Amino acid sequence: MGMTMTQKILAKHAKLNEVKKGQLIEADLDVVLGNDITSPVAIREFEKLGIEDVYDKTKVVMVLDHFTPNKDIKSAEQCKFTRSFAKSKGVVNFFDVGDMGIEHVLLPEKGIVTAGDVIIGADSHTCTYGALGAFSTGVGSTDMGAGMATGKCWFKVPGAIKFVLKNKPNKWISGKDIILHIIGEIGVDGALYKSMEFCGDGVEYLSMDDRFTICNMAIEAGAKNGIFPVDDKTMEYINSHKCSTMTKDVNIYEADEDAVYDEVYEIDLAKLKETVAFPHLPENTRTVDEIDKDIKIDQVVIGSCTNGRISDLEVVAEIMKGKKVADGVRVMIFPGTQKVYLEAIEKGYITTFIEAGAAVSTPTCGPCLGGHMGILAAGEKSISTTNRNFVGRMGHVDSEVYLASPAVAAASAITGKISKPSEII
């Protein structure tokens, strides 16, 4: 019986010839990741073990991105605690305000993650790195602490669902529309503890940023991980994002012809339309064409680990160029990293945003989790390029969050209601 791409990576890191769905294994780790919320708990668990040093000073990665720049005393203390630990242990890949970015945009940009890696992160959207052909998944702070000490983690080998992507998507249809469509089809538990394995001729039409977005939201379908095959675009990205702090070996895995999948879906990308997830679950999807009444919005958030990359900002700038944000609408744009921010400045995107009436912020996860910088009041509605729209996710429990692509978010910012780009371009 053959193995899926995910299973092959796990078998290699567990030093086994093969693994099977449901098998418990212990695997070597290439990266252990934490942020300013999860690292303090992991550090305390690490300290309980009585071990002097982390297993590898380059493979333990800490990014202060959630409540930064610090929003209050408690968040400042969390960051201080993490900063002190990283310094005392000589953690090389520690990213603080000024050079940090949103972690799941930053790590690929820095070349810290690559094809064939096994990565755990104390953040549920660690599944993002599957876009590079890696196995990456979110864990709790306890497993992060143990991983920092041992360089190993236990896993139950997941089953898999194959998604065969066909044909070329139309203009304005992005990775966000694709993954929202899929989640709408299978539900928020449709891939529970399974790997979402993407393949098909449609993959070649997807940019790396599209693939990052799709894998980022695999967890919103309950998946253990999402993963794409390694192709020329993947290798071009990897070769142009070399890690300066450690040597990374690229290992390419392909699913066996006789790999077993629990389900197989075919998605015709050419038939997809701009898709929005309505409150209060990512599965509550409709195309913009299916919205039968105006939904006026109070706030637009563009950015996050889902859609804070340069291609996302390029689309937003194209739509906003020469236009003004609708009266009464607050628009906040968060470049995913300092590098993305600087590139957006150099290309004139930031000027376009500010002239349109948007606020532009340093990289932060703040508004996505209702932490700071864009909290919603009771009764307010926001359209957002983030990844979750649960009750109270971005503020008051009586607020509403609609998830959409950067293109739909930008168009909505101009019209003041949920709209698609063709309505204004």
Swiss-Prot record:
Keywords: 4Fe-4S, Amino-acid biosynthesis, Branched-chain amino acid biosynthesis, Iron, Iron-sulfur, Leucine biosynthesis, Lyase, Metal-binding. The keyword 4Fe-4S applies. One of its GO terms (molecular function) is 3-isopropylmalate dehydratase activity. It catalyses: (2R,3S)-3-isopropylmalate = (2S)-2-isopropylmalate. Binds 1 [4Fe-4S] cluster per subunit. Pathway: Amino-acid biosynthesis; L-leucine biosynthesis; L-leucine from 3-methyl-2-oxobutanoate: step 2/4. CDD domains: IPMI (cd01583). Its cofactor is [4Fe-4S] cluster. Transmembrane segments: none annotated. It comes from the Bacteria. Its EC number is 4.2.1.33. [4Fe-4S] cluster binds at residues 305, 365, 368. The keyword Transmembrane does not apply. GO terms for biological process: L-leucine biosynthetic process. It is an enzyme of class 4 (lyase). Heterodimer of LeuC and LeuD. Catalyzes the isomerization between 2-isopropylmalate and 3-isopropylmalate, via the formation of 2-isopropylmaleate. Belongs to the aconitase/IPM isomerase family. LeuC type 2 subfamily. This is 3-isopropylmalate dehydratase large subunit. It comes from Clostridioides difficile (strain 630). The lineage of its organism: Bacteria, Bacillati, Bacillota, Clostridia, Peptostreptococcales.
